[in-house]
Amino acid sequence: MTTQFSVAGVELELLRYPTQQESNLQAWDAADEHLLKSLIESEQAAVPTAIINDSFGALSCGLSKLHPSWPLFVETDARTSFLGTEQNHGRNQLPMDNLQWFTSRDTLPENLALVLMKLPKNLSYFAHQLTRLSQVLPASTRVLVAAKSKSINSALLDIFAKHLGPASASLAWKNTRVITCVSDGKPRPLAKEVTWAIPEYQLEISNLSNVFAANKLDIGARIMLENLPKGDFKSIVDLGCGNGVLGLRTAQLFPEADIHFIDDSEMAVASAKANWARNQLPTDKGHFYWDDCMTHLPDDVQPDLVLCNPPFHQGEAITDHIAWQMFLDARRRLKEGGILHIVGNRHLAYHVKLQRLFKNCTTVASNGKFVILQAQKK
């Protein structure tokens, strides 16, 4: 794993979060390098700057290294990004008092003179971010967005024009480009919330823009709902909850149980919380955590059932470490006799991991693409 970041005289040691000693993934990419290199070569002044979608703090650490008092307004939807940025500032002995933190639902300040962004995979979420910027940025404010060259096309530039202002792309460097957008000073309204029904379970669901499977029930969740375990469950964790549909259904099936919703995405947790209220479930039975798996779950929460549909992406990276951490956390936090009940793509071979961790694994259901697996803590 490469940890030494070096661009235009800026030297840093950067780690992903959580740290993975055996991983070949690094905490930054060439788009981070390109964006920081462009700023240094243009001798950018230390003006109030928003940094958006900075995976593990490469951009904020780089600017703090250049000017320790650079006023930075860091926006992220991912708890691991927040924790990783903190970790890397500490590792490089950089100040933190020049940073202010924002989620993707918070309103950024109106005194911004520059915005730096990484292009997210989810373009609906990106459009939401640009729309929010249109509501606070004065005309002529520069927004610099770094991305892989293959991700940049006329359709993407049209998204800029529709939601913020005209944009153009730089020349390529290490297969990346930096898009420069100039705010036109015209505030745009946020997209209206869309609510959709799952009639067979008498549920109404809505998703914020960065939540997986917007406006429909994804196939993995559907097969999971059709194969939920039976038992006398009192404490249930919906781990990686997304919009919360699994936890909502278990609240219907086990009305005496406390349901704990956990996700790395703040928008996911907010969506689950809104859906809990929308479906008029008991306010004292739903609990919501923006967290890196179960790292900071209160000590008194000892679930007897953990439901999990693990992601196998972290940003642009394809990785199984999130699933591995979810399974480890489940084994650590489950009561004796408690159950981990998961859904996954067949090709991911999660049964091997569960057998290794729990010394048991049962196939509950499967189809051509997905498999439901269950392991018990003994």
Curated annotation (Swiss-Prot):
GO cellular component, one term: cytoplasm
UniProtKB keywords: Cytoplasm, Methyltransferase, rRNA processing, S-adenosyl-L-methionine, Transferase
Chief location category: cytoplasm
MF annotations from Gene Ontology: 23S rRNA (guanine(1835)-N(2))-methyltransferase activity; nucleic acid binding
Taxonomic superkingdom: Bacteria
Location within or outside the cell: Cytoplasm
The reaction(s) this protein catalyses: guanosine(1835) in 23S rRNA + S-adenosyl-L-methionine = N(2)-methylguanosine(1835) in 23S rRNA + S-adenosyl-L-homocysteine + H(+)
Pfam families (UniProt xref): MTS
EC class name: transferase
Enzyme nomenclature, EC number: 2.1.1.174
Coiled-coil intervals, chain numbering: none
Gene3D superfamilies per UniProt: Vaccinia Virus protein VP39 (3.40.50.150)
Job of this protein: Specifically methylates the guanine in position 1835 (m2G1835) of 23S rRNA.
Family: Belongs to the methyltransferase superfamily. RlmG family.
Name of the protein this chain belongs to: Ribosomal RNA large subunit methyltransferase G
Source organism: Shewanella sp. (strain W3-18-1)
